[in-house]
């Protein structure tokens, strides 16, 4: 963990546009999620995300809960990030983390970097403790594997 950010990266043998189209489609997030917590997009999410887009997710990590996210960074085929807040009681305790994807064309495909940025989270000090950063990095590595599987499938 570099300060308040955990990042993983992988070269995926596909162009940035194909990868970005997958990541910028909130309805596909359950398909790419390597943690198993993202269950389904809530009704009303835009077909493709853009700066300022808001979307909700049904989540499950021990218990079911809902989140709402807003796209806070957007550069077509290069970068997308959304800030996530739980809905309801949990929002008082854990809220504000940013999930970011950065894509760089490279030899053999695209370097994809996923980051978990807790610099604006209400409980960032608590989130740094224990094995959560390590566990999050492992889940993000699985997410990048799933993205590769989906964009390279015949």
Describe each model-derived feature in a short phrase.
Residues 31-32, 64, 92-93:
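Alpha-helix N-cap/helix-start motif
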Residues 1-45, 143:
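Hydrophobic ligand-binding cavity/cleft-lining segments
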Residues 2-4, 51, 63, 95:
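Residue-level preference for beta-strand/loop junctions
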Residues 41-90, 111-113, 142-154:
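Glycine-rich portal/gate segments that line the openings of hydrophobic small-molecule binding cavities
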Residues 86-138:
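Beta-strand/loop substructures that line and gate deep hydrophobic ligand-binding cavities in soluble
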Residues 8-10, 67-73, 96-105:
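Hydrophobic/aromatic beta-strand elements that line small-molecule binding cavities or substrate pockets
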Residues 16, 64, 96, 133, ...:
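A structural signal for well-ordered alpha-helical scaffolds and beta->alpha junctions
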């Amino acid at each position: 963990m570099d300060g308040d950010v955990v990042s993983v990266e992988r070269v995926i043998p596909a162009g940035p546009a194909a990868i970005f189209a997958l990541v910028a489609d909130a309805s596909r997030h359950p398909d790419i999620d390597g943690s198993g917590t993202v269950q389904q997009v809530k009704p009303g999410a835009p077909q493709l995300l853009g700066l300022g887009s808001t979307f909700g997710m049904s989540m499950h990590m021990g218990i079911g809960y809902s989140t709402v996210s807003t796209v806070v960074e957007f550069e077509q085929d290069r970068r997308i990030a959304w800030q996530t807040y739980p809905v309801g009681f949990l929002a008082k305790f854990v809220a504000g983390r940013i999930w970011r994807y950065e894509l760089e064309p490279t030899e053999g495909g695209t370097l994809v970097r996923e980051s978990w940025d807790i610099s604006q989270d209400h409980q960032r000090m608590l989130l740094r403790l224990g094995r959560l950063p390590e566990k999050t990095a492992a889940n993000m590595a699985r997410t990048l594997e799933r993205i590769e599987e989906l964009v390279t499938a015949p």
